[in-house]
């Protein structure tokens, strides 16, 4: 209520939206997959990029909101695309090493996406929010 969101929406829609609306997670998965493929010597075709984007989008919907969950999903996408040689695993370990600050940025993007949805649906009481 302090932020201008009705209690009925905050108790049901926000938890559901935070699980389903993970834009930052999907974007990070695609960027990390392309980075890892490039480091490992794979050539990513436009068709493969579309498949990676679809996999990341679908996987991000079911990704739990827990630290490190995105890294597990990333490995699943890499395995599904066949990017599993030694170079890919080394690049994946580099992503794991810097994953904590990346997750903070990804979470920020997820929250901004949820706020944009709330604003576009008219669910945000601006007079309360702007106080």
Can you name each region flagged by the protein language model?
Residues 1-16, 42-46:
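Membrane-embedded helical hairpins/re-entrant loop segments and their flanking transmembrane helices
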Residues 1-5, 19, 118-124:
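Helix-loop junctions at the membrane interface of multi-pass solute transporters
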Residues 4-12, 28, 93-97:
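Juxtamembrane loop-helix boundary motifs flanking transmembrane segments in multi-pass membrane proteins
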Residues 14-21, 55:
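Alpha-helical transmembrane segments of multi-pass membrane proteins
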Residues 21-22, 106:
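Alpha-helical transmembrane segments of multi-pass integral membrane proteins
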Residues 22-32:
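Helical hairpin unit composed of two closely spaced alpha helices linked by a short loop
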Residues 30-131:
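Transmembrane alpha-helical segments and their short flanking loops
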